[in-house]
């Protein structure tokens, strides 16, 4: 009976946490609204075949091939096969141009931008993680300067180089030869290219909904939809051929470069033979966009999942430990200021205004003092956050600031629960506490997906790289204008007690389900 009662209570908590002050009518409507960009992309893709051929632009059947060879190197001797008359010169220049591309565009330019931002302009916060100290760094551990931290450098400055290196490693193992094709590899590539392509965004969305602040999932949906809409419009406006087309018909073919050309499943035909079906073959024959190689939306979708999993997964910081002594003290000026004008009166649930380039005066959140403004705003429990230049210079070295009475007031979050350290320090939670699992699966998935697309002969490295650029651009836009200023800042205000939580948004979905239990900390990114 106890098991049945516990199961029933869990189901009830899941139901209530899912609705969260909504009803069964508004919940589906809210879901449709949040995922509207994704539905718009799917609608455009499905109806692309209705566009009259006379209105469509010319097909660029050679561009992706040459861009791949001269930007990433001709390791498969493709130029020798397709253009045997100029083999030696083209092979030499492919490595000269790819080396120049690597050095100039993937190393020097990102390094110059990083140096300009952090050493010339002296920006003292993570450009893409305004609240990095709050979400990602242990409270009592001394940190390196913000500009030298791995999180600051890796996203976005080192990502192009990371992509180039991994793509070429994957390219080596995806060589198009019968000797390289095996049943195991075929099925693994099919699983990644088809199954994970459909399920990974869903699993990422579930993770963000369960473990992250309300609104994070909407940002993921909008970032995904924005990049995919831009991608499918690029397919329609600048159509390019996939590698299977070049390998099947040759680089100089013109007969099949037209909009009546049927799609081709390429390496997935081998999977059909293994499984005894024709699903992949028939599915690609009916594709409404045959010449939609650049950008690769398989790469863009996988990379968007990667970006959100890597950037949002957090480690355990013992902020709400029942052992005491775990007060948040940040010793550097690397976290975005929750300014006075962002504080709201009781009952005011408006979203903080969008932060623009002219508003980027950063203050250390760990040195912001809660100021009692009850005399200024009648009967308001809210607090205002403000740090003047004088306060900045007189701040305590431990991350607190010294007020007029000479007292230090460290930043304090509202305790929604107390973490049982005897429970959270068990060996079973060690890997989870470091936030390692989401990052590991994100990296593994993107590496596997890039390999699968090349192994199945569906995309060049160039296609995949452009897909990464689309994903990064979409992520930066949504992160800058929505996620950081409108979602995370608002949520931190609520957790600080500065904003009244009238919509039960202080807790994540997982926290609501396990509210009052020993597992609540597990779903709290601030814990």
UniProtKB/Swiss-Prot annotation:
Pfam families: PAP2_3
Matches recorded under InterPro entries: Aur1/Ipt1, IPC_Synthase-Related
Biased composition (Low complexity): 376-389
Subcellular locations according to the entry: Golgi apparatus membrane
Role according to the record: Catalyzes the addition of a phosphorylinositol group onto mannosyl phosphorylinositol ceramide (MIPC) to form mannosyl diphosphorylinositol ceramide (M(IP)2C), the major sphingolipid in membranes of S.cerevisiae.
UniProt GO cellular component terms: Golgi membrane; inositol phosphoceramide synthase complex; membrane
Parts of the chain on the Lumenal side: 46-99, 174-190, 241-288, 457-461
GO molecular function: transferase activity, transferring phosphorus-containing groups
EC number: 2.7.1.228
Mutant phenotype after disruption: Fails to accumulate M(IP)2C and instead accumulates increased amounts of the precursor mannose-inositol-P-ceramide.
Transmembrane region(s): 25-45, 100-120, 153-173, 191-211, 220-240, 289-309, 436-456, 462-482
Gene Ontology biological process terms in this record: mannosyl diphosphorylinositol ceramide metabolic process; negative regulation of autophagy; sphingolipid biosynthetic process
Note: Present with 606 molecules/cell in log phase SD medium.
Domain of life the protein comes from: Eukaryota
Name of the protein in question: Inositolphosphotransferase 1
Keyword list, A-Z: Golgi apparatus, Membrane, Transferase, Transmembrane, Transmembrane helix
């Amino acid at each position: 009976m106890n098991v049945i009662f516990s199961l029933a209570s869990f189901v009830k908590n899941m139901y209530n946490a899912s609705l969260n002050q909504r009803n069964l009518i508004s919940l589906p409507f809210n879901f449709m609204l949040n995922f509207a960009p994704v539905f718009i992309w799917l609608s455009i893709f499905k109806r692309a075949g209705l566009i009259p051929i006379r209105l469509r632009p010319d097909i660029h059947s050679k561009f992706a091939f040459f861009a791949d060879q001269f930007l990433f190197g001709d390791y498969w001797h493709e130029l020798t096969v397709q253009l045997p008359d100029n083999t030696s010169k083209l092979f030499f220049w492919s490595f000269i141009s790819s080396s120049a591309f690597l050095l100039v565009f993937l190393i020097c330019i990102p390094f110059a931008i990083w140096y300009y931002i952090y050493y010339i302009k002296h920006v003292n916060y993570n450009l893409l993680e305004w609240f990095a100290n709050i979400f990602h760094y242990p409270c009592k551990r001394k940190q390196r300067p913000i500009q030298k931290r791995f999180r600051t450098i890796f996203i976005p400055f080192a990502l192009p180089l990371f992509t180039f290196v991994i793509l070429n490693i994957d390219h080596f193992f995806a060589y198009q030869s019968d000797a390289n094709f095996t049943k195991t590899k075929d099925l693994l590539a099919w699983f990644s290219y088809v199954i994970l392509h459909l399920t990974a965004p869903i699993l990422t969305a579930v993770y963000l909904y369960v473990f992250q602040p309300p609104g994070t999932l909407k940002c993921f949906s909008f970032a995904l939809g924005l990049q995919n809409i831009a991608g499918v419009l690029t397919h329609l406006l600048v159509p390019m051929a996939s590698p299977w087309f070049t390998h099947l018909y040759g680089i100089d073919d013109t007969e099949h470069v037209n909009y009546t050309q049927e799609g081709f499943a390429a390496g997935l035909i081998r999977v059909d033979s293994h499984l005894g079906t024709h699903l992949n073959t028939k599915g690609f024959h009916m594709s409404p966009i045959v010449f939609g190689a650049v950008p690769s939306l398989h790469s863009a979708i996988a990379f968007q999942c990667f970006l959100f999993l890597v950037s949002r997964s957090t480690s355990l910081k013992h902020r709400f430990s029942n052992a005491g002594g775990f007060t948040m003290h940040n010793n550097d000026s690397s976290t975005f200021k929750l300014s006075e004008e962002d504080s709201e009166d009781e009952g005011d649930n408006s979203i903080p205004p969008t932060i623009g380039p002219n508003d980027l005066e950063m203050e250390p959140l760990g040195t912001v003092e809660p100021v009692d403004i009850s005399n200024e705003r009648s009967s308001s429990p809210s607090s205002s956050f403000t740090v003047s230049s004088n306060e900045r210079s007189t701040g305590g070295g431990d991350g607190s600031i010294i007020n007029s009475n000479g007292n230090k007031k460290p930043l304090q979050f509202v305790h929604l629960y107390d973490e049982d350290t005897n429970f959270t320090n068990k060996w079973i939670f060690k890997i989870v506490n470091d936030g390692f699992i989401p990052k590991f699966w994100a990296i593994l998935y993107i590496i596997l997906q890039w390999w699968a697309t090349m192994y199945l002969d569906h995309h060049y490295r160039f296609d995949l790289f452009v897909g990464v650029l689309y994903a990064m651009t979409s992520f930066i836009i949504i992160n800058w204008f929505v996620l950081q200023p409108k979602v995370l800042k608002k949520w931190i205000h609520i957790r600080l007690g500065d904003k009244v939580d009238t919509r039960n948004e202080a807790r994540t979905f997982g926290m609501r389900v396990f509210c009052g239990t020993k597992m609540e900390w597990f779903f709290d990114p601030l814990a």
